[in-house]
C-alpha cells in the first residue's frame, strides 16, 4: 500500500537523519500488486524529493521492463556469480539496454568461489546456509571438488579465487557492480585486487571452461528462501 511504503520510507529517513535517500530498494515486492502501481508510488517519492532513485531486487526481465516503462529504474539487485548465472536470461541484457545498473550480490558464491569454501561444519553455523541446497551433502562436497580447478586457475593468474570471481563478474558488463561481503581485511584486499584485473578473452574462456553454466549442484535457495524472488527461465 502507498501509505505503508511512504511510512517505511519516512521511518528510514528519520533513522538515517537525512532528507533524501540516494537509492531506495524494493527487495521483495508483493506479487499481488502490479509492479506498475509500485513504480508509480516510487516515482512519487522522487517527485517529492524523498529519494533520488529506486531499484528492485530479484525480479524477472518482464517485470523489470514493465516497471521501467512507467518510470526509469536506477538499479536491479540480484544474485549473480559463476555459480548463479540466471540473470543472463534477460535481466542483465535489459539493464544494459536501458542504462540500469545491475548490482550483483553474492558474487563469490557464498564462499564456493573462494580459496576456502565453507565446509558443512561451518555451513550449519550460518542460518542462511544451514539448509541451503548447495551447502547440503552430497551437493556441498561435489561443489567444493568441482571448483578446485577454478581455484587452481586463479592461482596461475596471480589472484585469489574470490579475486578472480570478482574480475569475471566485472568483465561481464560495464553496468555490472558486484557487492561482495567480508569481515576479513585480507579477503577484502584480495577482492579489490581482482576488481583491478582486466581479464583477456582467453582468460575469460578459461574461467568459463572450468566452471561452465549450470555446474553447481543444488538450487541456490531452499523452498522457504524462494519466497519473494521471482523465478524465470
Predicted features, each with a name:
Residues 1-86, 90:
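Glycine/proline-rich, positively charged
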Residues 12, 21, 34, 54, ...:
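Conserved, mostly hydrophobic/aromatic
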Residues 87-125, 160:
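Aromatic-lined glycan-binding groove of carbohydrate-active enzymes
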Residues 50, 68-75, 94-103, 174-176:
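Glycine-enriched alpha-helix->loop->beta-strand junction motifs that scaffold or abut catalytic
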Residues 60, 80-84, 106-113, 168, ...:
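Glycine-rich beta-alpha junction loops
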